[in-house]
Amino acid sequence: MTSRILILIAAALLAGCAGIERETRPTVWLALEPALPEGTLRAGGPTVVVGRFAAAPPFDTDRVATRERGGQWAFAVYHRWAATPGEMVAARLREALGRLDLFGAVFTPPAPLDADYRLSGAVRGLWWDRESRSAVIEIEVALIAAPARLHGFWVRRAAVPVRGDTVEAFLAAASDAVAQVIAGLGGDIAGALADPSATPGREP
């Protein structure tokens, strides 16, 4: 009886140690760091408030999404975004708009004044495509002129090759993809601001 009790205790301890080992595996937090333009604000330019972007399911999570070969989706447990894709993209776009010589001020809501424009959007997808070996992002953005007139609507998508099989390689490619869509949106917004009569358009 005593030996049986000792065996049960040992088994319980081993199971507990295994659980502790699983729980202490570190989570790797990732943040998009796209290269940003080297400009500044435009003196006397219009003002814009850039709100938090939404993210379409199943990408409305901090877990890194992977499209495996065969089209199956997987979501990492130990590799997570430091914020949701919508939050990160909106923050990086906000930073970029402060460097594109387009606006006199770029605000995070709530803005301290009634801005001339409001920029809203959503991340349609952000994932690691294993089959095409690329980092893919697709976003949509709407530019609203005060008080509530649609001044522009665009969809941008970029796919950048992932040069390696590590999460670091994916992160570098994803950051480059975000930089590409931000650069494209910069051109879209510049065109809309230069032509007040411009009709909303979509990238082919």
Language-model segments: residues:
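Surface-exposed short loop/turn segments
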Residues: A18-L30, A35-G39, E95, R99-P147
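A structural "domain/chain start" motif
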Residues: A18-P85, A192-P204
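Envelope-exposed proteins and targeting segments
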Residues: G44-P46, D60-D62, R69, V77, ...
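Short secondary-structure boundary motifs at beta->alpha junctions and helix caps
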Residues: A74-R80, P147-G184
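Extracytoplasmic/secreted envelope proteins and their assembly/folding machinery
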Residues: G86, A90, R94, L100, ...
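Compositionally biased, intrinsically disordered linkers/stalks adjacent to structured regions
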Residues: F170-P204
